[in-house]
Curated annotation (Swiss-Prot):
InterPro entries: PCRF, Pep_chain_release_fac_I, Pep_chain_release_fac_I_sf, Prokaryotic/Mito_RF, RF-1. Peptide chain release factor 1 directs the termination of translation in response to the peptide chain termination codons UAG and UAA. Disulfide bonds: none annotated. The modification N5-methylglutamine is found at residue 238. This is Peptide chain release factor 1. Signal peptide: none annotated. Coiled coil: none annotated. Belongs to the prokaryotic/mitochondrial release factor family. GO terms for molecular function: translation release factor activity, codon specific. It comes from the Bacteria. It is found in: Cytoplasm. Methylated by PrmC. Methylation increases the termination efficiency of RF1.
Length: 361
């Protein structure tokens, strides 16, 4: 193991011991907020400590076995020492690999909930129907993760689906799992209205943003906002409300426009619209920071129209993620089993981080 990494692990080991002792003091035991904060910090490094302790234990056994080889003349003891050295060396190599991954820099947003925006792009009615299919896919996946889904804003389309839908998913480390969903999703299939059996291609754009919590302050000058109210409408623009409860907010400096009409009151819609706006502004800043990272990690959260990330080919029952050349059966994915593609994308992220880590040394 490299000296720099070993020293870092020793510091984490000492920090772990200090925190464990601190957790048992009367001052912390009587302060629930501090107790939970320290307990959470301990939990965040426990896996590293457990693997590192195994590394240290096996390193000690390895050194003892090497000493036996040098000092002993007994053939049986020498043979046992050789077996021990081979076993411990293999174990240590595996622990080093695990620690390398565990020590990779964490994305500060990984623990956050997400706000997802899906918009129909090329393809007219088919694109809007595809938006609805993607929403159902993410909803089913969220259900499988015991996560909660809340629709924040939606615009129904006459032919089915949505021209746009914005929703929140709340659960455990949701952003870490969905951050690479941003981009252009392409569908190839025969529409129900197609009489000649021709395959049509449509697209939808997906943007995944970390939900901003109260701890993060996003400064928005009220004078930078243009707020309009209007009557909420259903599919095809039909009015479904007799009061101006829907809200449209324009952030003048960035040109970001957000709307909300699904709540019954203007106050409720304004609150939701402001929440979406804050996440969009935060995501904009996040994209600027990601320009300094690897090409693959830049894709998280961008949702740029030029980035065709995935194709859903219905006739061939095939889903392909073009960023990592990953293909699998489409049906399980569209039914909400996103874990195979999520795991493949996260594995690629780890590989990129390891390569980047070595490149910076």
């Amino acid at each position: 193991m490299e000296k720099k990494m070993f020293n870092s692990l020793m510091k984490i080991h000492q920090k772990y011991q200090d925190l464990k002792q601190l957790l048992e003091t009367d001052q912390i035991l009587n302060d629930q907020k501090q107790y939970l904060q320290i307990a959470k910090e301990i939990a965040s490094i426990t896996e590293i400590i457990e693997v590192f302790q195994k590394f240290l234990d096996d390193q000690k056994v390895l050194e003892d076995a090497k000493t036996i080889l040098i000092q002993e003349d007994d053939p049986e003891l020498i043979q046992l020492a050789k077996v021990e050295i081979a076993t411990m060396s293999k174990n240590i190599e595996e622990y080093e690999k695990k620690l390398l991954i565990l020590m990779l820099p964490k994305d500060k947003n990984d623990e956050k909930d997400v706000i997802v925006e899906i918009r129909g792009a090329a393809g007219g009615d088919e694109a809007n129907i595809f938006v609805g299919d993607l929403f159902k896919m993410y909803h089913k996946w969220a259900d499988s993760q015991k996560a909660k889904v809340k629709v924040l804003s939606s615009s129904l389309a006459l032919a089915g689906g949505f021209s746009q839908i914005i929703f929140q998913i709340s659960g455990q480390k949701i952003y870490s799992k969905l951050k690479f969903e941003s981009g252009v999703h392409r569908v190839q299939r025969v529409p129900a209205t197609e009489t000649m059996g021709r395959i049509h291609t449509s697209t939808a754009t997906v943007t995944v943003m970390p939900k901003i919590d109260e701890k993060i302050e996003i400064e928005i000058n009220p004078s930078d906002l243009k707020i309009d109210t209007y009557r909420s409408s259903g599919a095809g623009g039909q009015s479904v409300n007799t009061t101006d409860s829907a809200v449209r907010i324009t952030h003048i400096p960035t040109g970001i426009v957000v709307t909300s009409q699904d709540e019954r009151s203007q106050i409720g819609n304004k609150e939701i619209a402001m929440g979406i706006l804050k996440s969009k502004i935060y995501n904009l800043e996040l994209q600027k920071q990601q320009q300094k990272q690897s090409d693959f990690r830049k894709l998280a959260g961008s949702g740029a129209r030029s980035e065709k990330i995935r194709t859903y080919n219905y006739p061939q029952d095939r889903l392909t993620d073009h960023r990592i050349n990953f293909s699998t059966s489409l049906k399980p994915i569209i039914q909400g089993n996103l874990n195979p593609i999520i795991e493949a994308l996260l594995a690629q992220e780890k590989t990129e981080l390891i390569l980047q880590n070595y490149a910076n040394k």
